[in-house]
Amino acid sequence: MFRTGKAIPIAPAKEDEALLNAAYDAVAEALAQGELVAIFPEGRITDTGELYPFRQGVKRIVERTPVPVIPLALKGLWGSFFSRRGGPAMSNPFHMRPFSKIALEAGEAFAPQAATPDVLQATVLRMRGDWK
């Protein structure tokens, strides 16, 4: 799944600074080639269904490769196979609620200099509404 999606491995600098730098290089290369790059700016999967604070990754990416940033809000993942509700994420194939509805909402693009972690998080929270 990750290979098909062209996932770029990443780790916090405190765990593996070389891998983090390689990830930023791979993102810059993908963007320069016109690829779309999706990131999860929280840096981890939520244990509660609520958003964690957005980290500085998007800011660092657009400082190096200034591109528009499109905020995306995932809705309905909490309680699904991909959430940590009831245990580790992606560990139980029967974890997904029957007929659960998952949605993705895209917002308006931000100019690179306007795409700060605080602005993006506020936008995603507004887009997500009461969904988890």
Q: Model segments located where?
A:
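A cross-family acyltransferase "interaction/gating" segment
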Residues: 47-115
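Membrane-interfacial amphipathic helices and adjacent loop/beta segments
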Residues: 1-32
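Short, cationic low-complexity segments
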Residues: 122-132
